[in-house]
C-alpha cells in the first residue's frame, strides 16, 4: 500500500503562463516507505519473468499443495495480492483508497469477475444475478469512497459487461450486427426502449432461450446504470475481444441513449477504445460525431489494448485479417491520433465530453498534458488519467502532485476471486510488464538513495 502521509499538492495545476513538461524521474517516490518500494521492485521483477506469467495458475496450485493454503495465501498477500489489490473487505478497500487520496490519487474500483470466451455454458441466470449484486455493492462502495461528502461530486467505476451476460450471446449479437442491413433490428434506440419499459424483445437472430437471456441481461445492465446514476457514479465499460466488442458497443450505445442525454449531467456510461486495433480511430471519430449530432454526452476511456497475442492467434487460426496494428510504433501513432481527436472534442463540447487517458506510456501522458494546456482544458476538468494500482506510480504520483485528476484501477476481493483475474491480466499485459524496466530502475534508485544516501536520479527519457 502507499504510505499514508498527507502531502501538499496543487489543485490549480500548471501555471497559466508557459507549459512546463512533467518530470517522471521518480522524485515522487519519496512519498513511499522503504517496504513499499522493496515490494514493488520485487513484484514487478517477478511479473516480468515470462514463466511466472505463463504458468501462474499452475504455480499457485503447486504452492498450495506444497505449503498449504494458509502459508501460500500469506505469501501472496505479502507480494502480488498486496501490490495489485486493495483488499477483500470494504474496510480494507477504504484504507487503501485513503492512502491513495492522501497522495493526490483517486479510486477506480473494478469487480474482478468476467466470463471468458468459450467458457462452459451456465445454466440459468443465477451466476449473472450474483454478479449484478456485486456490481451494485461496488457502486455503493465507489460512492462512499469520495474524498469529500459533496453530493454533487462524481465517482468512477469499471464495468465488465461479460459479468452480466454470456459471451456466447455477445458473439451471436456481434455476428448479427456485422451483417449489412440486418442490424436495424438491434438498434440502440430499440434496446434502450426495451430496457426502460421491460417489455418483451423479439429478435429474429436469437432463439427463445437466447432472447430470454438477452432480456435478463438488459434488465441487469439497466439496474446497474440506474443505481449508478442515482449514486452519481460514472461507469466505464471495459472493451474485450473483437469477437465481442461490436455487441458490447451496441449495448453501450443503448445505455448512452437513455442515460447520456444532455439533461443528465454529462456521460454516465463510457465506452473503451483500444488503439491497437486498426479501425479504432475511424470508429471513435464516427461515435463522437454521432453523439454530437444526437445531443448526447460522450465518455471515452482510451487504452492501447491488452489482447494482442490472442487477437493475432485467433486471426491466424481462422484465416482472417489480423485486426491489430502491425507493431508498437503503429499502435502509439494510433493512440496519439485518437488522443488528439478526443482532446479537440473536449475543448469544443466542454462538460458534454469526458476522457480518461488510460496509459502507462510517458510520451502519451506528456502529449495529453501539453495539448490540455494549449487547448485551455483545466487539469481537474473533464480529462483525467488512469493507471493500474501497483504500477506506473512514478507517472501517477507526478500527475497527482501537479493537480491532474488521476485514477488507479483497483480490483478487490478474496484471494480465490482475484488471483486468477490478476494472472489473466498479467498474461494479457505481458508487454506492459516487460516494459516496466524504467519503473524498476527508478525504484532501485530511490532505494539506493534511502539506504546509501546516493542522490542521483535517472534522467527522464
UniProtKB/Swiss-Prot annotation:
GO BP of this protein: proline catabolic process to glutamate
N6-acetyllysine modifications at: 310
Biological role: Dehydrogenase that converts trans-4-L-hydroxyproline to delta-1-pyrroline-3-hydroxy-5-carboxylate (Hyp) using ubiquinone-10 as the terminal electron acceptor. Can also use proline as a substrate but with a very much lower efficiency. Does not react with other diastereomers of Hyp: trans-4-D-hydroxyproline and cis-4-L-hydroxyproline. Ubiquininone analogs such as menadione, duroquinone and ubiquinone-1 react more efficiently than oxygen as the terminal electron acceptor during catalysis.
Catalytic activity entry: trans-4-hydroxy-L-proline + a quinone = (3R,5S)-1-pyrroline-3-hydroxy-5-carboxylate + a quinol + H(+); L-proline + a quinone = (S)-1-pyrroline-5-carboxylate + a quinol + H(+)
EC number per UniProt: 1.5.5.3, 1.5.5.2
Cellular component GO terms held in the UniProt record: mitochondrion
Domain of life: Eukaryota
Protein name: Hydroxyproline dehydrogenase
Gene source species: Bos taurus (Bovine)
Pathway this chain belongs to: Amino-acid degradation; L-proline degradation into L-glutamate; L-glutamate from L-proline: step 1/2
GO molecular function, one term: oxidoreductase activity, acting on the CH-NH group of donors
Pfam families: Pro_dh
Annotated PANTHER family: HYDROXYPROLINE DEHYDROGENASE (PTHR13914:SF29), PROLINE OXIDASE (PTHR13914)
InterPro entries, alphabetized: FAD-linked_oxidoreductase-like (IPR029041), Proline_DH_dom (IPR002872), Proline_oxidase (IPR015659)
Family from the record: Belongs to the proline oxidase family.
Keywords in alphabetical order: Acetylation, FAD, Flavoprotein, Oxidoreductase, Proline metabolism
Cofactors named for this entry: FAD
Keyword DNA-binding attached: no
Amino acid at each position: 500500500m502507499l504510505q499514508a502521509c498527507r502531502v501538499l499538492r496543487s489543485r490549480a495545476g500548471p501555471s497559466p503562463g508557459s507549459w512546463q513538461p512533467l518530470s517522471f524521474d521518480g522524485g515522487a517516490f519519496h512519498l513511499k516507505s522503504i517496504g513499499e518500494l522493496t515490494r514493488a521492485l520485487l513484484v514487478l521483477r517477478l511479473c516480468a519473468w515470462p514463466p511466472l506469467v505463463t504458468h501462474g495458475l499452475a504455480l499457485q496450485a503447486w504452492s498450495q499443495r506444497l505449503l498449504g493454503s494458509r502459508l501460500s495465501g500469506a505469501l501472496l498477500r505479502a507480494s502480488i495480492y498486496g501490490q495489485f489489490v486493495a483488499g477483500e473487505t470494504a474496510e480494507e478497500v477504504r484504507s487503501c483508497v485513503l492512502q491513495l487520496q492522501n497522495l493526490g490519487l483517486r479510486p477506480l474500483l473494478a469487480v474482478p469477475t468476467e466470463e471468458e470466451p468459450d467458457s462452459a455454458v451456465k445454466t440459468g441466470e443465477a451466476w449473472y444475478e450474483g454478479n449484478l449484486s456485486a456490481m451494485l455493492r461496488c457502486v455503493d462502495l465507489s460512492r462512499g469512497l469520495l474524498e469529500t461528502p459533496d453530493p454533487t461530486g462524481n465517482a468512477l467505476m469499471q464495468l465488465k459487461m461479460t459479468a452480466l451476460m454470456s459471451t456466447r450471446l455477445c458473439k451471436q449479437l456481434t455476428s448479427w450486427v456485422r451483417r449489412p442491413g440486418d442490424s436495424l433490428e438491434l438498434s440502440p434506440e430499440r434496446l434502450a426502449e426495451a430496457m426502460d419499459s421491460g417489455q418483451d424483445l423479439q429478435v429474429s437472430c436469437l432463439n427463445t432461450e437466447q432472447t430470454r437471456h438477452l432480456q435478463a441481461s438488459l434488465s441487469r445492465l439497466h439496474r446497474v446504470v440506474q443505481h449508478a446514476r442515482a449514486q452519481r457514479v460514472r461507469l466505464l465499460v471495459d472493451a474485450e475481444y473483437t469477437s465481442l466488442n461490436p455487441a458490447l458497443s451496441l449495448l453501450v450505445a443503448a445505455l448512452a441513449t437513455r442515460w447520456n442525454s444532455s439533461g443528465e449531467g454529462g456521460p454516465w456510461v463510457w465506452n473503451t477504445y483500444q488503439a491497437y486495433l486498426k479501425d479504432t480511430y475511424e470508429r471513435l471519430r464516427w461515435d463522437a460525431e454521432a453523439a454530437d449530432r444526437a445531443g448526447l454526452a460522450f465518455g471515452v476511456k482510451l487504452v492501447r489494448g491488452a489482447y494482442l497475442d490472442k487477437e493475432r492467434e485467433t486471426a491466424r487460426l481462422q484465416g482472417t485479417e489480423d485486426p491489430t496494428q502491425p507493431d508498437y510504433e503503429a499502435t502509439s501513432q494510433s493512440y496519439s491520433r485518437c488522443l488528439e481527436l478526443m482532446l479537440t472534442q473536449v475543448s469544443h463540447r466542454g462538460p458534454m465530453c469526458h476522457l480518461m487517458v488510460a496509459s502507462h506510456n510517458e510520451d502519451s501522458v506528456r502529449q495529453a498534458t501539453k495539448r490540455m494546456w494549449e487547448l485551455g482544458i483545466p487539469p481537474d476538468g473533464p480529462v483525467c488519467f488512469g493507471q493500474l494500482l501497483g504500477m506506473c506510480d512514478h507517472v501517477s504520483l507526478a500527475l497527482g502532485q501537479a493537480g491532474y485528476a488521476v485514477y488507479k484501477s483497483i480490483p478487490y476481493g478474496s484471494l480465490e476471486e482475484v488471483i486468477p483475474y490478476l494472472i489473466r491480466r498479467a498474461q494479457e499485459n505481458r508487454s506492459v510488464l516487460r516494459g516496466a524496466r524504467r519503473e524498476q530502475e527508478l525504484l532501485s534508485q530511490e532505494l539506493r538513495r534511502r539506504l546509501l544516501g546516493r542522490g542521483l536520479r535517472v534522467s527522464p527519457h
